[in-house]
Design a protein with these regions (language model features):
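A domain-start/cap signature at the N-terminus of enzymes
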Residues: 17-97, 174-176, 186, 238-250
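Primarily recognizes the serine-hydrolase "nucleophile elbow" in alpha/beta-hydrolase
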Residues: 162-163, 169-214
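Alpha-helical scaffolding within the catalytic cores
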Residues: 113-125, 156, 201-211, 234-238
């Protein structure tokens, strides 16, 4: 027993001599915040603006200035409408669109519309620099209100408006004689699709929806020479009066010493164009 204790004591002393204390590893922590920040990894974000602005290309009008005779076919109605289209010099996007509906004498012959009615009057005033794009559709029958013609006309206007980036808040409809019948029908049916209406020398053939008519400013015109013209003037007076009674904005201008044929052009004086474009 005594020997065993001595052996254990010797082993303990040998182990104690062999063991060497290892110094502890200490991580130094700086108490200086500035020093800590200087040792951090920082990603710099530039706040400088580009020295040169990105150039925006100028708007390029999709059609050259001038006269066009084309045909539109409506996908829904499958009806056709021939039309004369005038693009003025200096045309740009968001221009107004002025539509002129012809009378019986121009049915089926859109080439006549290049020098007739509103187009003729505008060219005498503005030359080739109209302040609007002019559209003169041409029917193949003596009516603007039969069948699907009104719907096809709206389709044509939508097509032109999209292709030429028209200002859809400035779509003006005008017409002479049977074309005036079409004007009354279109504002009665489509209301504020149009921003203004100028019917010349004819009343309506069907009952008008006053709820729609009062949404459109109307400046009607009629001459005072000829039996038929006097009848048309009376018809138009009654319509204008009814629109006013229902709270709408409508007036009738009597063109002194003008017959039915003459009113097709003389109704479109410069102040009338200005009125149309202001509505």
């Amino acid at each position: 027993m005594k020997k065993a204790c001595i052996v254990c004591l010797l082993l303990f002393l040998l182990c104690a001599c062999a063991f060497e204390a290892q110094p502890a590893e200490v991580t130094s922590v700086s108490s200086d915040p500035a020093e800590e920040f200087s040792q951090a990894t920082v990603t710099e974000i530039s706040t400088e603006m580009p020295t040169e602005a990105v150039a925006v290309p100028p708007y390029i009008f999709p059609m050259e200035p001038g006269s066009y005779l084309e045909t539109y076919q409506d996908e829904e109605t499958q009806d056709h409408l021939d039309y004369y289209l005038f693009i003025p010099e200096g045309a740009s996007d968001k221009m107004p669109l002025v539509i002129f509906l012809h009378g019986d004498g121009e049915v089926g012959n859109p080439a006549l519309l290049e020098d007739f009615g509103l187009i003729k009057a505008a060219r005498e005033i503005y030359g080739e620099k109209f302040p609007f794009i002019a559209l003169s559709p041409c029917t193949r029958v003596e009516s603007w209100i039969s069948g699907s013609i009104p719907q096809t006309l709206i389709g044509l206007i939508d097509d032109i408006s999209e292709r030429l980036s028209i200002n859809t808040d400035r779509i003006i409809i005008t017409g002479h004689s049977r074309g005036a019948i079409g004007v009354w029908h279109m504002i009665s049916t489509y209301g504020d699709f149009f921003s203004a209406a100028v019917p010349v020398s004819c009343g309506a053939e069907t009952a008008l929806d006053m709820e729609n008519c009062v949404q459109v400013p109307v400046l009607a015109h009629a001459g005072n020479i000829g039996k038929n013209e006097n009848i048309y003037r009376e018809q138009m007076f009654n319509i204008v009066h009814k629109i006013k009674e229902n709270g709408g904005n409508a007036d009738l201008i009597v063109l002194e010493n003008k017959n039915h044929t003459q009113t097709s052009t003389c109704a479109f004086a410069e102040d009338v164009f200005l009125w149309m474009l202001e509505q």
